[in-house]
């Protein structure tokens, strides 16, 4: 078992990473302030892991709240179901919420914790690779709006993040690939040697080789913890964690939440960010192609939806959270391992990026 720390002063918390942590009270008891706990999960994860988690919560009064599964349910009506359950069972301010599931559950449970009686404790127990390496760490919580992804929410830090790598054994291959989009992101934005490591270990990652998976999670969480510790509320460097996300969120919104998995949209969006960085002269063609090949090896789509026009992208990107004073800012790369956030680019470069034939670009790279 490995422990990392997110250093935020009085809001600091540990990240526990290991196998078979879910049923062990040692990782939960120090972070539960009262006797009452509400476990927020979904219809897919609860049958697999709720019973095991309950073993770690013996001695506490537990309210399970099982929600429908999927990005399409990350909205007000589903959030209301959490509040309904908490109020019906008369949970008070000493209640601890535990998010047992992927990114959707973690985001909604965290937002519910931020809002319920103006703030109660919560613990993240992420069960997908994407949530383990990204969304469970850093305190971003919230829900989607029909006009934009994650536009309603709060920064609210958990008491702890408990990552049980055994939960990945039941993860569908499509979800595993989606999570790898966020793992690869860390190499692209701040850790070029990690890119080489991922190239060397991608087959082992896809095969869920335990020591390799644990190292990938630890390196990803360590990178996320460093960035969050330096910029909790995304006023500066934390925005670099959104590489590929502005393009990706546009894909998710246009296609309908849940049609493309978040990581899939980020994968295609990252290809677009690589292409734009190349067009600006910041990435060589070889660097761009290296990035695309790695994303493709991870099983990710490297071509955005063919039916999406440049105008479709611009419509959705106009409501991105990184827009300031009406100016779109993007996360781009000035070399692999060096991300920048900038709104200082020629409009025609963005337009050309949105109109690029990504199918032809992918075909040009050939098969692995």
Swiss-Prot record:
**Record-annotated residues binding Zn(2+)?**
182, 245, 262
GO MF: 3-dehydroquinate synthase activity; metal ion binding; nucleotide binding
| Cross-referenced InterPro entries | Dehydroquinate_synthase (IPR050071), DHQ_synth_AroB (IPR016037), DHQ_synth_fam (IPR030963), DHQS/DOIS_N (IPR030960), DHQS_C (IPR056179)
- Required cofactor(s): Co(2+); Zn(2+); NAD(+)
Q: What is its EC number?
A: 4.2.3.4
**What keywords are assigned to this protein?**
Amino-acid biosynthesis, Aromatic amino acid biosynthesis, Cobalt, Cytoplasm, Lyase, Metal-binding, NAD, Nucleotide-binding, Zinc
Pathway involvement of the protein, from the record: Metabolic intermediate biosynthesis; chorismate biosynthesis; chorismate from D-erythrose 4-phosphate and phosphoenolpyruvate: step 2/7
Disulfide links within the chain:
none
Quick check: keyword Lyase in the entry?
A: yes
**Where this protein primarily resides, as one coarse class?**
cytoplasm
Q: Where does NAD(+) bind?
A: 69-74, 103-107, 127-128, 140, 149
BP GO annotations? amino acid biosynthetic process; aromatic amino acid family biosynthetic process; chorismate biosynthetic process
Q: EC top class, in one word?
A: lyase
The reaction(s) catalysed by this protein are: 7-phospho-2-dehydro-3-deoxy-D-arabino-heptonate = 3-dehydroquinate + phosphate
Q: Name one GO cellular component term.
A: cytoplasm
User: What does the record note about the cofactor?
Assistant: Binds 1 divalent metal cation per subunit. Can use either Co(2+) or Zn(2+).
Protein's cellular compartments: Cytoplasm
What role is this protein assigned? Answer: Catalyzes the conversion of 3-deoxy-D-arabino-heptulosonate 7-phosphate (DAHP) to dehydroquinate (DHQ).
> What family name appears in the similarity comment?
Belongs to the sugar phosphate cyclases superfamily. Dehydroquinate synthase family.
NCBIfam families per the UniProt record, alphabetical:
aroB
Report the protein name in the record.
3-dehydroquinate synthase
């Amino acid at each position: 078992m490995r422990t990392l720390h997110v250093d935020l002063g009085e809001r600091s918390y540990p990240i526990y990473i290991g196998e078979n942590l879910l049923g062990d009270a040692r990782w939960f008891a120090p972070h539960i302030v009262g006797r009452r706990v509400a476990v927020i999960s979904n219809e897919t994860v609860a049958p697999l892991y709720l019973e095991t988690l309950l073993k770690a919560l013996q001695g506490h009064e537990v309210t399970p709240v099982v929600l429908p599964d999927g990005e399409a349910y990350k909205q007000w009506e589903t959030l209301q179901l959490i509040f309904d359950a908490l109020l019906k069972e008369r949970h008070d301010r000493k209640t601890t919420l535990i998010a047992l599931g992927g990114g959707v559950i973690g985001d909604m449970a965290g937002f519910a914790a931020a809002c319920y009686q103006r703030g109660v404790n919560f613990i993240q127990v992420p069960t997908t690779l994407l949530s383990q390496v990204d969304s469970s760490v850093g305190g971003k919580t919230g829900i989607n709006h029909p006009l934009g992804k994650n536009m309603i929410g709060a920064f609210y830090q958990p008491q702890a993040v408990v990552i049980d790598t055994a939960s990945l054994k039941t993860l569908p291959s499509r979800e595993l690939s989606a999570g790898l989009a966020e793992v690869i992101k860390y190499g692209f934005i701040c850790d070029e040697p990690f890119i080489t490591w991922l190239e060397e270990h991608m087959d082992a990652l896809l095969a869920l080789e335990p020591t390799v998976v644990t190292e990938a999670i630890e390196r990803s969480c360590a990178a996320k913890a460093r960035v969050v510790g330096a910029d909790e509320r995304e006023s500066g460097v934390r925005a670099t964690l959104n590489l590929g996300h502005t393009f990706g969120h546009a894909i998710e919104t246009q296609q309908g939440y849940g049609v493309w998995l978040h990581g899939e949209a980020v994968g295609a969006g990252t290809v677009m960010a690589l292409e734009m960085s190349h067009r600006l002269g910041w990435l060589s063609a070889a660097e761009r192609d290296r990035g695309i090949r790695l994303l493709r090896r991870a099983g990710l789509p490297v071509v955005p939806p063919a039916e999406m026009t440049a105008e479709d992208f611009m419509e959705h990107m106009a409501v991105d959270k990184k827009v300031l004073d009406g100016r779109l800012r993007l996360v781009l790369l000035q070399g692999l391992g060096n991300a920048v956030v900038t709104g200082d680019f020629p409009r025609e470069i963005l337009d050309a990026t949105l109109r690029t034939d990504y199918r032809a670009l992918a075909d040009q790279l050939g098969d692995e």
